[in-house]
Design a protein with these regions (language model features):
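Mixed-charge, Lys/Arg-rich low-complexity intrinsically disordered regions
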Residues: 1-12
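Short solvent-exposed loop/turn micro-motifs enriched in small/polar/acidic residues
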Residues: 6, 34-36
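Short active-site-proximal "capping" loops at secondary-structure junctions
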Residues: 31-32, 48
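Intrinsically disordered, low-complexity, charged/polar segments
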Residues: 47-72
Length: 72
């Protein structure tokens, strides 16, 4: 089964619980070639830190469920 992805490279995001991180930009997507493997995104936030998140909406730890939201 293919993963349902939430974020794409270039998306601007914020985190609902960590507003002091500032706005972030998705700079990298990684997809596992193994069945059931992780789909990850790397986000560069305004505080200068890169943070990685699970990007599969079918996974209970998806970045959407942990508070990452797209800025439109």
């Amino acid at each position: 089964m293919r993963p349902r992805l939430y974020l794409r490279v270039g998306d601007r995001v914020v985190h609902l619980r960590y507003h002091y991180w500032g706005e972030g930009v998705v700079i990298e997507e990684r997809h596992s070639s193994l069945e059931g493997g992780f789909c990850l995104v790397k986000v560069l936030f305004e505080d200068g830190e890169e943070r990685s998140f699970i990007n599969d909406l079918d996974h209970e730890c998806c970045c959407y469920y942990s508070g990452v939201r797209i800025v439109y």
